[in-house]
């Protein structure tokens, strides 16, 4: 069963879900602790750019923990934004508000669906000097994550999804998508120990079904230098789709034998690519 089949009943509600603005209760996870680098006007004294991390569907900001630890150890200020997962346009607006609080250059990093979000958010954010796609979507204008996922064979996500209805603020019903708990390890993070993936499954953040079918309105990778980490054992986004997007974006590309949850299983490799991108902002 492909992903399009799994979420087809939600297409007529895409316009409504895309307008959901339930982000007021969402928090910003800043790797710098209470004295957050996200504080307006704050810029650490070091010349290194701020790294802003945007998680994707079926995850939360803690999926970046291993990457954050390494970046901070190397002297980078880091912010891990809480992606609302409601739709690329509204999620990008939220991330854009995070970027406005940062002074100086930014390396913007997106995992999975977060790639769609950073492509939109960076378009109106001149301080973004580099984009890093980590097992991520990099849609062109008019493309959706769903379309790109189904463009090449290999994704088994559709059969692993658990659709859950939720009430919309203005009336009606939307659909959130989770990965079934008994499918999570194999589908999302096969190279992560099962005790860890059990926790990840329990704490996963759902994505609005309509978000995966919402078309991109811009593609920041056309004007901002990009880096791409392709995961060759990925059952969410087919490796062939990742290669297609990376090649089209003329991204500096690295391939790794890893699952979709590469930031958890291989945080060192993710960090190295981010730092490679970051070094270009200080040249």
Model-derived features: where do they sit?
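Conserved serine/cysteine hydrolase catalytic core
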Residues: 202-249, 253-267
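Post-His helix in hydrolase/transferase enzymes
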Residues: 264-280
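Secretory targeting and sorting signals
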Residues: 1-38
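Gly/Ala-rich beta-loop-alpha elbow adjacent to hydrolase catalytic centers
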Residues: 109-114, 118
């Amino acid at each position: 069963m492909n992903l399009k089949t799994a979420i087809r009943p939600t297409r007529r509600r895409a316009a409504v879900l895309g307008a959901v603005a339930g982000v007021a209760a969402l928090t910003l996870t800043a790797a710098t602790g209470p004295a957050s680098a996200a504080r307006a006007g704050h810029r650490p004294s070091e010349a290194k750019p701020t790294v802003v991390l945007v998680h994707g569907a079926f995850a939360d900001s803690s999926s970046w923990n291993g990457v954050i630890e390494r970046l901070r150890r190397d002297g980078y200020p880091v912010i891990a934004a809480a992606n609302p997962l409601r739709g690329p346009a509204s999620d990008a607006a939220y991330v854009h508000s995070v970027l406005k609080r940062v002074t100086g250059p930014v390396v913007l990093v997106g995992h999975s669906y977060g790639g769609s979000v950073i492509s939109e958010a960076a378009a109106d954010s001149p301080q973004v000097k580099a984009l890093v796609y980590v097992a991520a979507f990099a849609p062109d204008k008019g493309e959706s994550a769903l379309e790109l996922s189904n463009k090449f064979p290999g994704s088994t996500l559709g059969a692993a999804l658990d659709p859950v209805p939720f009430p919309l603020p203005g009336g009606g019903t939307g659909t959130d998508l989770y990965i079934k708990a008994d499918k999570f390890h194999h589908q999302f993070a096969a190279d992560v120990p099962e005790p860890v993936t059990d926790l990840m499954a329990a704490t996963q953040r759902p994505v609005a079904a309509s978000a995966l079918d919402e078309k991109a309105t811009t593609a920041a990778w056309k004007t901002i230098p990009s880096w791409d980490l392709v995961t060759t054992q990925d059952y969410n986004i087919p490796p062939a789709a990742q290669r297609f997007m990376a090649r089209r974006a003329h991204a500096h590309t690295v391939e790794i034998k890893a699952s979709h949850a590469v930031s958890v299983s291989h945080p060192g490799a993710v960090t190295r690519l981010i730092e490679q991108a970051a070094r270009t902002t200080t040249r």
